[in-house]
A protein has these predicted regions:
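A short, basic N-terminal segment
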Residues: 1-40, 45, 355
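C-terminal leucine-rich, beta-strand-based interaction scaffolds used for sensing/assembly
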Residues: 2-7, 292, 296-375
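Short, locally clustered residues in the helix-turn-helix/winged-helix DNA-binding domain
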Residues: 34-35, 163, 255, 269, ...
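P-loop NTPase nucleotide-binding core
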Residues: 38-39, 44-48, 52-156
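Conserved Walker B catalytic segment
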Residues: 127-196, 204
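Helix-loop-helix "sensor" segment of P-loop NTPases
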Residues: 201-252, 275-276
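C-terminal helical "lid" of AAA+/P-loop NTPase domains
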Residues: 247-253, 259-273, 311-314, 346
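Conserved C-terminal helix/linker of AAA+ ATPases
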Residues: 271-293
Length: 375
């Protein structure tokens, strides 16, 4: 049988510690917090590897064998109902591989939804619940927390993009969750978020329910030299190596952000070039290839914007992390009006085209940023 060779540079999800670069100290710290029954607020920009770190922590032997590990991403949730839906689905997904006795206990706790759970031909449960089936989200949430409290093992629940709850139309969600989490002694939580300003307010402001409720962890870019060693260890499988200069170019081109570096390395690993030593030109060609592949998707994305919104987006990409969009210098350089910018920037922020973090504006998607710079 022909064996398909695995590309070791994973760009979606988590496979195993072998394909996870470094984060040894961060994994140890997160593991220590959770096993010491501390909740954690994990704060870092998107695509820096927060979810990978959480999964890597969950794969540690003393975690994997002794806890039920649950991960949910609430980035796309828009209200309390959708949060409860995502939490219930995430728990069932985590419990299904652990056998009938484990997941059946959870389903028996969900009396408010029991009639809407279906089963496949093998008798395994499927989350066939519709959002409209959650008629009383507070009651369903109580049932979920009753399960967490009574589960046969302690539970670790990671909620990714946790800052989303602050944008729900229901303004009491933070207090609702804080109260239940405070009274749940059989579970600990990782609150992971990418919008640092919002997360900092949620966990350090005296007026917010989660004030001083969790240990706060930041995440920095992986050390460049460590990442280079990881890259060459795996490139060697395909009889390739990347030069230190080429990797430095790649690393700094994307500010050390893991996902983009992984994506380019993924492409270089399978490139048809017969060169054994990859140089800076090879990295440039790899990036150009990715931008070419994404061209039509980006065209469709930009089609959603008005001409003025697109003009501002291009200006931010060209300027490279401007600190002010209302300065006369910026407005004149890109032929923008102040009123135009005020209206457009809110749309771009709300729709996650751009982010404002640490005093600067930048595009959320660095490949899109490079594409706009190239014209």
């Amino acid at each position: 049988m022909l064996m398909v060779q695995l590309n070791p540079f994973i760009i979606e999800g988590y496979l195993s510690p072998e394909y996870f670069c470094d984060r040894v100290e961060e994994t140890a710290l997160l593991t220590r917090h959770l096993t010491n029954r501390c909740n954690v607020a994990l704060i870092a920009p998107r695509r820096l590897g927060k979810s990978g770190l959480i999964y890597n922590c969950f794969q540690q032997e003393n975690i994997r064998e002794q806890y039920h590990c649950i991960y949910i991403d609430i980035y796309d949730t828009k209200n309390f109902n959708e949060f409860v839906y995502a939490l219930g689905k995430g728990i069932l997904t985590a419990l299904k591989p652990k056998g009938r006795k484990v997941w059946e206990f959870f389903l028996n706790m969900l009396q408010s939804l029991k009639s809407t759970i279906s089963f496949d031909i093998n008798g395994n449960p499927e989350w066939s619940v519709g959002l409209g089936d959650i008629q009383a989200p507070d009651i369903t949430l109580d049932e979920i927390f009753a399960y967490l409290e009574q589960a046969d093992k302690p539970c670790l629940v990671a909620i990714d993009e946790f800052q989303s709850v602050a944008n729900y139309p229901e303004k009491t969600v933070e207090a609702t969750l804080r109260k239940r989490i405070q009274n749940c002694h059989n579970a600990n939580f990782v609150f992971s978020g990418s919008k640092r300003h919002m997360m900092a307010l949620m966990f350090t402001s005296r007026s917010r329910p989660f004030y001083h409720s969790s240990s706060i962890m930041g995440l920095e870019a992986i050390n460049e030299h460590t990442y280079l060693e990881f890259a060459n260890h795996h490139l060697a499988r395909n009889n390739k190596e990347i030069s230190a200069a080429a990797f430095t170019y790649l690393y700094h081109h994307f500010d050390g952000i893991t996902w983009y570096i992984q994506y380019v390395l993924n492409m270089l690993y399978t490139s048809i070039s017969d060169k054994s030593l990859l140089q800076e030109d090879d990295v440039r060609m790899g990036i150009d290839g990715i931008l070419s592949q994404q061209r039509f998707a980006y065209q469709a994305l930009l089609y959603q914007l008005t001409a003025k919104q697109k003009q501002l987006l291009i200006a931010i990409a060209q300027e490279d992390k401007p600190s002010s969009l209302m300065s006369q210098e910026f407005l004149q350089k890109y032929h923008l009006g102040a009123s135009t910018v005020q209206g457009a920037v809110k749309t771009l922020l709300d729709r996650d085209f751009i982010t404002q973090d640490e005093g600067v504006y930048q595009l959320c998607d660095k490949f899109l940023e490079l594409s706009l710079r190239a014209g």
